[in-house]
């Protein structure tokens, strides 16, 4: 594997890493990314960009305007997770119960690095590079608020990046079409009739109903969806009951459904409702079903994918184009619904021990920081390939 970090990125490597470590040490949740947004805005202003703050509540948009050519948006998310960090790195989180356990600190640092390099090449660019620094990717859909505030106005293409500890340093995961799934959630409340465990005949046992329901829901994936099209229905929580000798009158189930297509997303929801209605009628239980649409599938456009792949290949050679798919969800999908887009993964697991790396959302998550230079280089190369004159 031949990795060629761009010299102009290599020259600011210490700065990129320092920014990432500073943000890692001071993580912020959701839309409350005030310190991070201030750092971003200050650095973009120093680079002489047209900077807008308060976009999508606490997001930052920087425009590098260099002529009448196309406008390309590059996006990074800024928010952390509600996790207590247990690692022992020197830049460990100082905010109790908050941690950058998904790499968004690195995403912000990589995009700031690319912004610095590209701002120094503005006289060679024909077009506009729009840098999108987004809050609240983790579940709150910050992308929608950014879009509502006009961040995609005039944009021709959008690109998003994600560090990924399931791939080793030097690999870039990207594919045409679906790359991330729709991420929906649901709650099912089973209401039966309680009673004594020794005399169950007069009750409607919510535990028994839940057991049949959980089993039946698994047939959606195994018997209703095409086995060549990945889908998931998972029950992650069961709550209810009072004691060993009491028939439970209420059970609450919570779970998630994932699919790569809107068709399968609709199929899952429809079949869940049919199964719930049938089992409720069979056992005489009242069952409430609350299904909440999450992020839609992230679909990479063909032309944007081909451009990204070509640029990434110049940086990591045959390490580019690893056809990685994830059943995770990402609100970059909202950008990709509005304009042609491409989302890609940058491997951040140690090259010599990729299968021992700590995964995202773990309390001692960390990355191979060399991956930051790969990400910045790909962003810069992408703009050079498309807008350089």
Model-derived features: where do they sit?
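Acidic/His- and Gly-rich active-site-bordering loop/insert found
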Residues: 2-100, 105, 109-125
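Hydrophobic face of alpha-helices
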Residues: 13, 17, 34-41, 111, ...
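General beta-strand structural signal in soluble alpha/beta enzymes
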Residues: 52-54, 76, 131-133, 157-161, ...
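Histidine/acidic-residue-rich, glycine-tolerant segments that coordinate divalent metal ions
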Residues: 60-61, 81-83, 88-99, 106, ...
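Non-cysteine beta-strand/loop elements that form the S-adenosyl-L-methionine
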Residues: 73-75, 186, 343-349
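Metal-dependent amide/peptide-bond hydrolase catalytic core
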Residues: 211-389
């Amino acid at each position: 594997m031949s990795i060629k970090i761009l010299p102009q990125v290599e020259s600011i490597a210490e700065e990129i890493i320092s920014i990432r470590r500073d943000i890692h040490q001071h993580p912020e949740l959701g839309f409350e990314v005030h310190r991070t947004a201030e750092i971003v805005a200050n650095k973009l202003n120093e680079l002489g960009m047209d900077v807008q703050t308060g976009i999508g509540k606490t997001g930052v948009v920087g425009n590098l305007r260099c002529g009448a050519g196309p406008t390309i948006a590059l996006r990074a998310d800024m928010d952390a997770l509600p996790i207590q960090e247990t690692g022992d790195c020197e830049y460990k989180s100082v905010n109790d119960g908050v941690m950058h356990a998904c790499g968004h600190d690195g995403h912000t640092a990589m995009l700031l690095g690319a912004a610095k390099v590209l701002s120094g090449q503005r006289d060679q660019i024909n077009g506009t590079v729009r840098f999108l620094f987004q809050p609240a990717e983790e579940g709150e859909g910050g992308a929608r608020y950014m879009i509502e505030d006009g961040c995609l106005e005039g944009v021709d293409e959008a690109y998003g990046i994600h560090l990924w500890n399931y791939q080793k340093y030097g690999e870039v995961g990207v594919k045409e079409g679906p790359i991330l799934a729709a991420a929906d959630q649901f709650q099912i409340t089973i209401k039966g009739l309680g009673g004594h465990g020794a005399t169950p005949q007069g009750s409607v046992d919510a535990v028994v109903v839940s057991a049949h329901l959980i089993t039946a829901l698994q047939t959606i994936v195994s018997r209703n969806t095409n086995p060549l099209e990945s889908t998931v229905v998972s029950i992650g929580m069961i709550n209810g009951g009072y004691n060993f000798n009491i028939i439970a009158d209420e059970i609450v189930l919570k779970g998630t459904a994932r699919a790569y297509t809107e068709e399968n997303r609709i199929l899952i929801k429809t079949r869940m409702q049919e199964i719930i209605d049938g089992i409720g009628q069979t056992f005489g239980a009242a069952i409430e079903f609350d299904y909440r649409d999450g992020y839609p599938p992230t679909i990479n456009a063909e032309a944007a994918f081909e451009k990204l792949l070509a640029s990434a290949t110049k940086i990591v050679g045959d390490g580019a184009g690893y056809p990685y798919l994830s059943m995770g969800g990402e609100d970059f999908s909202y950008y990709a619904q509005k304009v042609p887009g491409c989302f890609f993964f940058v491997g951040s697991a140690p090259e010599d021990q990729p299968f021992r790396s700590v995964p995202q959302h773990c309390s001692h998550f960390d990355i191979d920081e060399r991956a930051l230079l790969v990400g910045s280089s790909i962003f810069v190369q992408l703009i050079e390939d498309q807008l350089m004159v």
